[in-house]
Design a protein with these regions (language model features):
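A surface-exposed partner-binding patch
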Residues: 1-96
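Alpha-helix C-terminal capping segments
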Residues: 1, 100, 131-132
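Short, flexible loop/turn elements at secondary-structure junctions
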Residues: 93, 113-114
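Short, compact, well-ordered microdomains
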Residues: 107-110
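Short, solvent-exposed coil/turn segments at beta-strand boundaries
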Residues: 85, 102-105
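Papain-like cysteine protease catalytic domains, especially those used for deubiquitination
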Residues: 63-64, 114, 118
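Compact, glycine/acidic-enriched structural inserts
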Residues: 117-133
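Broad, structure-driven detector of short, well-ordered beta-strand segments within folded domains
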Residues: 96-102
Length: 133
């Protein structure tokens, strides 16, 4: 898969710091993806949920605090709704979030307006394998 607009990760410690903030430990596959493609946009960006076909991933969120769309800003803006339930890592063009379910590591789509949730995949690898063009 090709990636565009990657923002070089300033420090691996940023991933650890975010994990401490949200009280969630990312899987190794996700950490490796962030290290290689922080804040990037994959060429395969379309995915289906259990309710809607052809949703579009705009980009992964950056772990660098000074970047425009970051896990830090998104979590801060939505912490009341997301706290202890969902950990954001991606965003679509409308501000909806792609998140880890903090209770079972499944990947979900969270509508930012009403916080409704749609299932995407059993885990991060499953999510990546479901992306298409």
């Amino acid at each position: 898969m090709e990636w565009k607009y990657i923002k070089k990760l300033k420090s691996i410690d940023l991933i650890d710091d975010f994990e401490c903030l949200v009280k969630y430990v990312f899987c190794d596959e996700f950490r490796e993806c962030v290290i290689a493609n922080n804040g990037g946009r994959p060429s395969k960006k379309i995915f289906d949920t259990d309710k809607v076909k052809e949703r579009v991933l705009k980009s992964f969120l950056s772990f660098n605090k000074e970047d425009r769309e970051t896990v830090w800003k998104i979590f801060d803006w939505n912490k009341e709704e997301l706290a202890n339930k969902y950990v954001p890592f991606g965003i679509d063009n409308f501000g909806n979030l792609i998140c880890f379910n903090a209770n079972n590591d499944k990947i979900v789509f969270v509508n930012h307006e009403d916080m409704s949730v749609e299932a995407i995949a059993e885990n991060f690898n499953g999510f990546m394998s479901k992306l298409y063009e």
